[in-house]
C-alpha cells in the first residue's frame, strides 16, 4: 500500500517533444500561426530611404522560422504599431491581425516618400502649389506660347524689315520714272497741223501760240507734234534717197551681152544670112602678077587677085 501511494504522489513524466506521439500529432496552433517576418524592419528602412514600392507590386521577402530564444528581436521592434505598408502588429506571441489601421497622414510626414499608387492621387499637403501652377498655365493662352517660341523668327523678320528700309533710304536708288501720257489728236487737229507743216517746217513762237489757240491745244503739245513730224519727215527723206541710190547703182551694173547661141530653127536662117554677106576685098590687089628676079621663084607669082 505505501508503494502505491508513492507512485500516485509522483507527478507524471513530461512528454518529450520528440516522442512518436508528439511527432504524429501536429499542433493546430502552430500550423495555423503564420510565420514571423524577419525582414519587415528592413523593408520599413528601405521605404524610409526613398524606395517607394507600390502596394500591388511590393517585393515579397522570404520569411524564415528562427528560434525566438536565440535570435529574439528587441521589445520595441516586436511591439511597434502597424504601418500602412503592413497591417499586422508584431508581438511575442506572433502576428495578430488588427482591424483598425491608423491614417496614413498621421504616419507620413511632409518629407516621407510616397508609393507609385499615391503619386497618381493629388497631394493634400501641397494644394496651393498645384492651384498656382494651374492658374499660371490657364493664364497663358496658346497664342502667347506660340509667340514665345517664335521669338527668333520675329527677330529675323525685324532685321529684314530694317534692311528693306535701308535700301529705300539709300541714295543710289534711282527714282521710278513716271509714265508720260500720250496726247490724242482729233482728225481736224491733225489735218490743220499737217497743212501747216507742209507750208512751213519750223514755226516761230508767235505762230506756234496762234496755232495752239486755234486748235485748243497748248504750245508744248504743238511744239512736240512738230518735232515728231520733222523727225518722221527726215526718216522718209533718208529712205527715199537710199532707194534712189540703190536703183541708180543697179542700172549702172547692167551690161549688154551679145547672143552667141541660137535654137535649131534659127540656125538655118543665120547660115543663109551669113552666105549673103559680101566678102571684103583685100587691101592690096595687083592687076598683074608680080615676078621676082630670083631664078628659083621666077615663075611663082607673089599675090594673085581674087
From Swiss-Prot:
Entry annotated with the keyword Transcription regulation: yes
Keywords of the record: Developmental protein, Differentiation, DNA-binding, Homeobox, Neurogenesis, Nucleus, Transcription, Transcription regulation
Biased composition (Basic and acidic residues): 117-143, 153-174
Region Disordered, annotated ranges: 95-181
Gene Ontology cellular component list: nucleus
Location in or out of the cell: Nucleus
GO biological process: cell differentiation; nervous system development; regulation of transcription by RNA polymerase II
Domain of life: Eukaryota
Matching InterPro entries: HD, HD_metazoa, HMX_Homeobox_TF, Homeobox_CS, Homeodomain-like_sf
Keyword Transcription: yes
Molecular-function annotations in GO: DNA-binding transcription factor activity, RNA polymerase II-specific; RNA polymerase II transcription regulatory region sequence-specific DNA binding
DNA-binding region(s) from the entry: 178-237
Function: Transcription factor involved in specification of neuronal cell types and which is required for inner ear and hypothalamus development. Binds to the 5'-CAAGTG-3' core sequence. May act as a stage-specific inhibitor of anf1 in the anterior neural plate during the development.
Family: Belongs to the HMX homeobox family.
Name this protein carries in UniProt: Homeobox protein HMX3
Organism expressing this protein natively: Xenopus laevis (African clawed frog)
